[in-house]
Swiss-Prot record:
This is Probable pectin lyase F-1. Keywords: Carbohydrate metabolism, Cell wall biogenesis/degradation, Disulfide bond, Glycoprotein, Lyase, Polysaccharide degradation, Secreted, Signal. It is an enzyme of class 4 (lyase). It is found in: Secreted. It catalyses: Eliminative cleavage of (1->4)-alpha-D-galacturonan methyl ester to give oligosaccharides with 4-deoxy-6-O-methyl-alpha-D-galact-4-enuronosyl groups at their non-reducing ends. It comes from Aspergillus terreus (strain NIH 2624 / FGSC A1156). GO terms for biological process: cell wall organization; pectin catabolic process. Pectinolytic enzymes consist of four classes of enzymes: pectin lyase, polygalacturonase, pectin methylesterase and rhamnogalacturonase. Among pectinolytic enzymes, pectin lyase is the most important in depolymerization of pectin, since it cleaves internal glycosidic bonds of highly methylated pectins.
């Protein structure tokens, strides 16, 4: 089992901080080097930024300011679909209208949305995209890794303001026919659709670590000021390490993984994440998924694990008892960490032994954990931008 504690990840020389990638990829994305030894470069214009992100050259691209794509590709005036998630009668926030071609269950309303947010930048292979201090922001534009591209690090940037008032307004990070991606120490907020989404193609080997997923919004499909579309992981053959993330003020898909619409297979190791203030559900797990969930802390989460997760055909090991924690010792070589709930809904016991059998095949990709009692303080102190 590979160890990836906060102390080892943050033990860097002063000269390295904010000058290049901080730390080393771990978990399923271990071996990801991004731009490798390429000298850090700072783009001077949006055009140069896009050119560097999309070309075939290994690069370390420093984001030292807010790159605002709003308006750079014009806007679209049209008709959006208004449903109950738009009108939000009795809700505590406005809703989201839907950018789509049909409106059988609602009424058409006039809408104007920004085009750039709906057209993500296709990131080439061998890229490190690194924010400087707390200054690195991509506004109005997401990133997509597709077409077989791989070996990408996205670290210490804030992706925000992608048509947040509209469903289908844009995704922050898309993985579709990709591999070896490390998404670390970022913040994502005010997104129209998914914070992170995989397409029908494989996302491959991915580590999502130390990120802040901030769902506070004035436009919510749940009508409660909390973003619904958090993470949708449905790729063809995917392996996820999801660790030390702060997921707060969302209302659904936090995360959703698996699908019965394809032959998708997913192994997901979720460890030491802090789920806070979730006015809906956190884990929603579908078929063809093996999920090992340990050391996660749920505070004020309505539904930590959906009921449909228990009947979908998903295989889940969620460490509900002392015995189930100790049962990890033989196949995995360590005692799993309990999950903890505070002011939250039910964490229904699931201990599918096939998950441990599957996990034993990937022992080198399983990461160490801290005590679950330390998760809220440690994660909040370290997750997000400006905390390398």
């Amino acid at each position: 089992m590979k160890t990836a504690t906060f102390s080892t990840l943050l033990a860097l020389s002063a000269s390295a901080v904010n000058a290049q990638v901080s730390g080393t990829a771990f978990g399923f994305a271990a071996g990801t080097t991004g731009g490798g030894s390429a000298a850090p470069e700072t783009p001077s214009s949006i055009d140069e930024l896009v050119e560097w992100l999309t070309d075939d050259t290994a690069r370390t691209i420093m984001i030292d300011r807010t790159w605002d794509f709003t308006g750079t590709e014009g806007t679209t005036d049209g008709q959006c679909c208004s449903t109950r998630t738009t009108t939000c009668e009795g809700g505590t926030s406005a809703g989201q209208a839907w950018i789509q071609d049909t409106c059988d269950d609602g009424t058409w309303v006039s809408c104007t949305y920004d085009n750039a947010a709906k057209n993500p930048i296709n990131v080439g292979s061998n890229k490190s995209i690194v924010g400087v201090g707390s200054d690195g922001v991509l506004k109005g534009k997401g990133l997509r890794i597709t077409g077989g591209n791989s070996n990408v690090i996205i670290q210490n940037i804030h992706i925000t303001d992608l048509n947040p008032q509209y469903v289908w307004g844009g995704d922050a990070i898309t993985l579709d026919d990709a591999d070896l991606v490390w998404i670390d120490h970022n913040k994502i907020s005010l997104i129209g659709r998914q914070f992170i989404v995989s397409g029908w193609g494989k996302a491959g080997r991915v580590t999502i670590s130390n990120n802040e997923f901030d769902g506070v919004t004035d436009w919510s499909a749940g009508c409660n000021g909390k973003h619904y579309w958090t993470l949708l992981l449905i790729g063809e053959q995917d392996f996820y390490t999801f660790s030390d993330n702060w997921v707060h003020d969302v209302s659904g898909r936090a995360p959703h993984m698996g699908t019965d619409m394809t032959e998708s297979t997913i192994f997901f190791h979720g460890v030491n994440n802090y789920f806070q203030n979730i006015g809906g559900h956190a884990f929603d797990i579908d078929t063809n998924t093996w999920a090992l969930l340990e050391g996660n802390y749920f505070e004020s989460v309505d539904t930590p694990l959906t009921e449909t997760s228990l009947t979908s055909g998903a295989l889940i090991y969620n460490v509900p008892t002392v015995d189930s924690a100790s049962a990890c010792t033989s196949p995995l070589g360590y005692i799993c960490e309990w999950n903890r709930l505070a002011g939250s809904g039910t964490w229904t016991e699931r201990t599918d032994a096939d998950v441990l059998t599957m996990a034993s095949q990937y022992i080198d990709s399983l990461i160490d954990h801290i005590p679950v009692a330390d998760v809220p303080t440690t994660v909040v102190a370290n997750a997000g931008v400006g905390k390398l």
